[in-house]
Structures are given as C-alpha cells and as structure tokens.
C-alpha cells in the first residue's frame, strides 16, 4: 500500500517540479568569427527583439507555436500563412518586407487573432449546408463506393428511443419469465425428491 503511494508521489513531484530551461532557448550562441567573453545565459522572450550587439547579425525568425484544432503549426515570425486565418492588414504588412521582422505587438496580435478565430468557429452540425456541401465535395472526389450503403441507410427508418426502450422492456420481461420457469421447474424437482 505504501509503495504505490510513494511511487505515485515521486512521479507527481518529478512531473510538477520546475525543470531547468532548455539550453537552446537560453542563448543564441556566439557570433561566428567574433571572440566574446563568457556570458551568463538569459532566457529568450519570443515576443521581444534580441539584444543588438556591435556586429550586424542576420535576422532570425522566432517560432510561435499555435494550436489549430487538433494540429500544431510552427510558424516563423508572422502567422499570415495559416490556412484558417485570412490576411489582416498587420500581417500583410509583415509579408511585404523582405528581411523585416514583425513587431512584438503585431506578433501577439496575429497569435491572439488566430486563437480567437479558432475558438469562435461555429460548430457545424451534420445537416448544416456547409457540412452537406463538404460531404458532397468529398463524394465527388472519390466516395462513390459509399453511395449504395448510404442509400440503404436512408431507406431504413431510424429507430426511435421509445421503440428501443420498448424492446428492452420486452427482453427483460422474457428473461424474467424464463427465470421464473426455471425456478418453478427446480421447485417441482425438489418437491418430487422430498415427496418420495
């Protein structure tokens, strides 16, 4: 009893204790060809511009991890290439510059715009016009083998809940009657044995 408790407590402690940050995120590394004194690594903030050094560096895009439905997209810099997000004026300005980086405000605006868009997407029912059009396009692309099965399903009337519960009640009554018949048979046998 104590061993599983101790093991589960240990697993929870390991899972919940803060771990040291990833070294790849701590520093960008030395600039090639330049000698630098050893520095203490500082965590990076993806929405803040990196500190500028004396020598010019190539601009690097910062990744933003964004959850879209059940898939994760890794976007570098701006999020205007997201399939679910239309181009906003801020993101179209970002795409215009060849080596320009998005400002922190634009990056956060893009992130939250796409996140809100995903949260506010209407849930489509199976009989909505958009869902019917999507199914029609899928059938036109190669779902012809499902047509006979779908026709067969549409011919059968749907089973209502009342009918389902009625059938369940009848099955339970039949089982109860069979159990009573078996009990009566065993009682008869017992009475025959005792009566002899």
Swiss-Prot record:
Subcellular location: Secreted
Expression (tissue specificity): Produced by the hypothalamus and placenta.
GO molecular function: corticotropin-releasing hormone activity; corticotropin-releasing hormone receptor 1 binding; corticotropin-releasing hormone receptor 2 binding; hormone activity; neuropeptide hormone activity; signaling receptor binding
Protein name: Corticoliberin
Gene: CRH
Annotated family: Belongs to the sauvagine/corticotropin-releasing factor/urotensin I family.
SMART domains: CRF
Role of this protein: Hormone regulating the release of corticotropin from pituitary gland. Induces NLRP6 in intestinal epithelial cells, hence may influence gut microbiota profile.
PANTHER family, sorted: CORTICOLIBERIN, CORTICOLIBERIN/UROCORTIN
Residue segments, region Disordered: 32-61, 85-105, 136-158
The keyword Disulfide bond appears for this protein: no
Skewed-composition ranges (Basic and acidic residues): 146-156
PTM-bearing positions, type Isoleucine amide: 194
Pfam families: CRF
GO (cellular component) term, any one: neuronal dense core vesicle lumen
Annotated Low complexity bias: 38-47, 85-104
Effect on the protein of changing residue 187 to A: No effect on affinity for CRFR1
Outcome, altering residue 183 to A: Strongly reduced affinity for CRFR1
GO BP field: adrenal gland development; associative learning; cellular response to cocaine; cellular response to dexamethasone stimulus; chemical synaptic transmission; diterpenoid metabolic process; female pregnancy; glucocorticoid biosynthetic process
Keywords, comma-separated and alphabetical: Amidation, Cleavage on pair of basic residues, Hormone, Secreted, Signal
Assembly, per entry: Interacts (via C-terminus) with CRFR1 (via N-terminal extracellular domain).
Propeptide residue span(s): 25-153
Top-level taxon in the UniProt lineage: Eukaryota
Gene3D superfamilies given in the database record: 6.10.250.1920
Residues in the signal sequence: 1-24
């Amino acid at each position: 009893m104590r061993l599983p408790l101790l093991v589960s407590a240990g697993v929870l402690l390991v899972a919940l204790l803060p771990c040291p940050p990833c070294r790849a995120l701590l520093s960008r590394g030395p600039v090639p060809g330049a000698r630098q004194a050893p520095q203490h690594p500082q965590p990076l903030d993806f929405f803040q511009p990196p500190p500028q050094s004396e020598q010019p560096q190539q601009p690097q895009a910062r990744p933003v991890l964004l959850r879209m439905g059940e898939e994760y997209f890794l976007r570098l810099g701006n999020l205007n290439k997201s399939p679910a997000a239309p181009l906003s004026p801020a993101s179209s300005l970002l795409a215009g510059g060849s080596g320009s980086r998005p400002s922190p405000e634009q990056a956060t605006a893009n992130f939250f715009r796409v996140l809100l868009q995903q949260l506010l997407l209407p849930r489509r029912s199976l009989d909505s016009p958009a869902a019917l059009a999507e199914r029609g396009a899928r059938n036109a692309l190669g779902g012809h083998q499902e047509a006979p099965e779908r026709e067969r399903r549409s011919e059968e009337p749907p089973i209502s809940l009342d009918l389902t519960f009625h059938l369940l009640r009848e099955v339970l009554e039949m089982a109860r009657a069979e159990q009573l018949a078996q009990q009566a048979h065993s009682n008869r046998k017992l009475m025959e044995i005792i009566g002899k």
